[in-house]
């Protein structure tokens, strides 16, 4: 048994890999190939609307002394679903810290007020 965790930057790439997997045929006598499952989350592809929203967040961040850079991490969030629906979506606006989803995960407490202000001011600007 093999489990595949497929992550891709575009839906087109997901479809290309899925087609390749579906085309596979067993080569060993008596072997069988059964594919199950499917796309868990669509890729969060950048859109003009999301990039415009990021520009607004970046400007607000600069005024607060925060340096925001666009990034892609290849993970998954609920934002993947809203982005796939065409809703302008930003991810990563939460607290600053590290070691996400691990026992050693932490938040930099002195940064909480600025991160909170960033989100509040962005919402007020919408």
Where are these regions (language model features)?
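Metal-dependent amide/peptide-bond hydrolase catalytic core
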Residues: 1-126
